[in-house]
Amino acid sequence: MSLVHINILMAFTMSLTGLLMYRSHLMSALLCLEGMVLSLFILATLTILNSHFTLANMMPIILLVFAACEAAIGLALLIMISNTYGTDYVQNLNLLQC
């Protein structure tokens, strides 16, 4: 395993740790989730480029499209929640009321 792969896996684990530790605000959780998806995108791209598997060249592009959709939906939910409740604290949200 090369140093680049180790750094990308470390970025993924740091984003996962950030998601688990800083989940009081919705914005910080969304940023950590975006970091996880982007590190997975880079790891998938490097793996496909190193393996020279030509049939899977579309997988990183599909993953990038899903990351963009996830970011757009997350920001729309953040705006809706902050307009409705006046804050972005995750503790104030109740799934039974939403």
Curated annotation (Swiss-Prot):
It is an enzyme of class 7 (translocase). One of its GO terms (biological process) is ATP synthesis coupled electron transport. Belongs to the complex I subunit 4L family. It is found in: Mitochondrion inner membrane. Signal peptide: none annotated. This is NADH-ubiquinone oxidoreductase chain 4L. Core subunit of respiratory chain NADH dehydrogenase (Complex I) which is composed of 45 different subunits. The chain crosses the membrane at residues 1-21, 29-49, 61-81. It comes from Monodon monoceros. The keyword Disulfide bond does not apply. GO terms for molecular function: NADH dehydrogenase (ubiquinone) activity. The gene is MT-ND4L. The keyword Mitochondrion applies. Core subunit of the mitochondrial membrane respiratory chain NADH dehydrogenase (Complex I) which catalyzes electron transfer from NADH through the respiratory chain, using ubiquinone as an electron acceptor. Part of the enzyme membrane arm which is embedded in the lipid bilayer and involved in proton translocation. PANTHER family: NADH-UBIQUINONE OXIDOREDUCTASE CHAIN 4L, NADH-UBIQUINONE OXIDOREDUCTASE SUBUNIT ND4L. It is a multi-pass membrane protein. Its main location: mitochondrion. It catalyses: a ubiquinone + NADH + 5 H(+)(in) = a ubiquinol + NAD(+) + 4 H(+)(out). GO terms for cellular component: mitochondrial inner membrane; respiratory chain complex I. Keywords: Electron transport, Membrane, Mitochondrion, Mitochondrion inner membrane, NAD, Respiratory chain, Translocase, Transmembrane, Transmembrane helix, Transport, Ubiquinone. Pfam families: Oxidored_q2. Its EC number is 7.1.1.2.
